[in-house]
Amino acid sequence: MKNWRTFILGLALCANGALAAPQVVDKVAAVVDNGIVLESEVDNMLSTVKHGAQEANQQLPDDTTLRRQILDRLIMDNIILQLAQRTNITISDEQLDQAIGNIAAQNHMSLDQLRSRLPYDGIDYNTYRTQIRKEMLIAEVRNGEVRRRVTILPQEVESLAQQIAAQTGNGAEFNLSHILIPLPENPTQDQLDKAEELATSIVEQSKSGADFGKLAITYSADAQALKGGQMGWGKLEELPSLFAARLQGAQKGSIVGPIRSGVGFHILKVNDIRGGDQKVAVTEVHARHIMLRTSVVMTDQQARAKLEDIAAQIKSGRISFAAAAKQLSEDPGSANQGGDLGWSSADAFDPAFRNALMHLKKGEISTPVHSSFGWHLIQLIDTRQVDRTDAAQKDRAYRLLFNRKFAEEAQTWMQEQRASAYVKILDSNGQ
């Protein structure tokens, strides 16, 4: 059950004492293989559903129909719980505690607050835990059984991804800022060179984090210069074709340009994008490192001091980073390549390594960094933006196909389980 956490909290908090009410007389509502469904279980859920519907102003069918649906649900749950028992699937106390903690967090409560809340709703905490454990077991069994039945072919993913791609960008709007470096009507080569040089410098400053609005006020000849170059929102088809062509695939925060037109050089900043599907880009880094491992003969302090000495030698020109890595690095995967780690997403690295790497400028060498692997001296060689839109569209297509097929197979699987089980209904109202 995808939303079992939310379901159970809603079930429990609106139960109005049903789960905790003592039962003087109980009857069997249905026999299910080696188990039973009690009348009290049906009555409790009936009361719960009615209370919840009243709170939500939701209309319900007549009692006979509602009771039959509830009994069917409890029978199915019983079948699955017996399957869990036969296949030795269990939910540990640790898993249960984590789930209840998640329920509390999702409802902006601490675990203690949740425990304190339950008695006010007439719910015993141990009964609550038992009910959640059942729901978790049911979800675990069903998901495991149904997942094995779902088959997704590569051509299905490709076909759906192409459909998604065909729809990408439709209706997207861009919030832009603009800087214009003007040119005279018939510019000389010198005027062209100077204007292009200034425009290129502004692009570099912007990409390095300079305030685009301030640069616009300082340099732009556009009518909106004093407003920081703000152009506001617009669709691609509403923009000059020169702009639209260069904005294809741009991301929020992108600096685009310089773009040459008849009036000068243009620089655009994408402040935001709304509507449509945005392109998916990730930052990849090209780095190299020297790694030392600590041991009985190499303490943390010694490793750090040795890397500091190596860094000083590299910066003074006495040895290159690559040569030092080949001689000294204890990373067998990169030492022979001069410590070169190639291109990779920053997320692929150890958190401490990644954090240090992302604070480096191109060519800069870090101070010694301690990670779960050892001590590192890191150099950032370059960064690049890589379009992952195609992969993202295929991932989305796969998820859509899986969810669709899972829902279909889950229904079929439950029908098969019900058909193969021995069920005798004794509740005349649930017939």
Swiss-Prot record:
Pfam families: Rotamase (PF00639), Rotamase_3 (PF13616), SurA_N (PF09312). GO terms for molecular function: peptide binding; peptidyl-prolyl cis-trans isomerase activity; unfolded protein binding. One of its GO terms (biological process) is protein folding. Residues 1-20 form the signal peptide. Its EC number is 5.2.1.8. HAMAP family: Chaperone_SurA (MF_01183). This is Chaperone SurA. The lineage of its organism: Bacteria, Pseudomonadati, Pseudomonadota, Gammaproteobacteria, Enterobacterales. The gene is surA.
